[in-house]
Amino acid sequence: DVHFTARVADVAACYCEKVRINPGNYVDPGRVFKHLEYTDAEYADELKKIEAKLVPFLNICKEHHTAVRIGVNHGSLSDRIMSRYGDTPAGIVESCMEFLRICKRENFNDVVISIKASNTVVMVTTVRLLVETMDHEDMHYPLHLGVTEAGEGEDGRIKSAVGIGALLTEGIGDTIRVSLSEEPECEIPVARQLVDNIEACAILREKAEASIADDTITITLDDEDWQTMQLKVAMATGALLIDRKAHQLVINNPHFSAERLVGLADAILQAARIKFTKTEYISCPGCGRTLYNLQDTIARIKAATSHLVGLKIGIMGCIVNGPGEMADADYGYVGAGRGKISLYRQKECVAKNIPEAEAVERLLQLIDDDRKKQ
């Protein structure tokens, strides 16, 4: 999984079966939210720079029979793309298509695509637009689906099911990953349940759509397992809510209390970004770049902030997607190196390289100070 240094991808392609590159930082520098002005000729020159680095990489991949994942993240779009297309689904798609067009010209077809965002509405809208754009340009590459930085616990599972399920029930997607801020093995059972319930949830989605009245989806199930039921409801209603065909959700199931079902409905509405009834957390699954105890930190921040309804907090392992995925968050906690943390207020880094032992308290103090000023 290569970021920032294209040469690393060249070396990895000699030894690995598949290499992921990120169009947002493969050639372009990491985003700093700076607006850039280009003439059409200057912009074309930027595309030539991509081709100059990508074609040799593709040739190495051909030689070693290495596959490539072009993995676009909403959080790491380049300033070049953002300046020309805005922070939009169209910009995310174009970031991918610039690379796909080169692959097609070079007759390199061992390509998988992923378009990920922590915002389910952005993720679903963008993947649909990508499919439409690829069809228009006669491209047919497999799609990997995921809601990035989905979080952990029930909320992370529900957010993943809303986004991934919306597309799976439309017949879009070839592979999936449920990204949870938990031990990696916790992701597989959830992903398996999503895949195993595609057909059932597609039928349930039709019934849910037929039920819409007074801006409300009413869905009835008889599942006795709580997680199975919550994933099925999220999958079946995700697209309907993301498309704003309804703004309210009623869930009926004789095996669970009304209070618990209302809580599930609220969680699904929040995952679809319709109604916010609790603090919103964006947190990544962690990887080799995460140099602090992510799970413990999330638990501590949640324990101290869960009463702040509507507040959005990003808790990120590193800078690759951190500042970008948190661009619409109120506050951010981002790994900055071994034992070091940087804190953000919206897009602004307000404290750099804080010792990890102090960082959670510093974040809470920042939030408290800002709230006192309001």
Residue ranges and their predicted role:
Residues 1, 70, 113, 167, ...:
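Conserved, mostly hydrophobic/aromatic
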Residues 2-98, 223:
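Active-site beta->alpha loop and helix N-cap motifs at the rims of alpha/beta catalytic domains
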Residues 16-33, 170-185, 245-258, 335-349:
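Glycine-rich phosphate-binding active-site loops on the catalytic face of alpha/beta enzymes
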Residues 37-50, 54, 82-308, 312-315:
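Catalytic alpha/beta core domains of metabolic enzymes, predominantly
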Residues 307, 330-331, 340-343:
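Catalytic-core signal marking the mid-to-C-terminal active-site face
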Residues 320-328, 337:
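A C-terminal functional module that forms or caps the active site or interfaces directly
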Residues 338-341, 349-372:
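Beta-strand/loop-dominated core regions that host nucleotide or nucleotide-derived cofactor-binding catalytic loops
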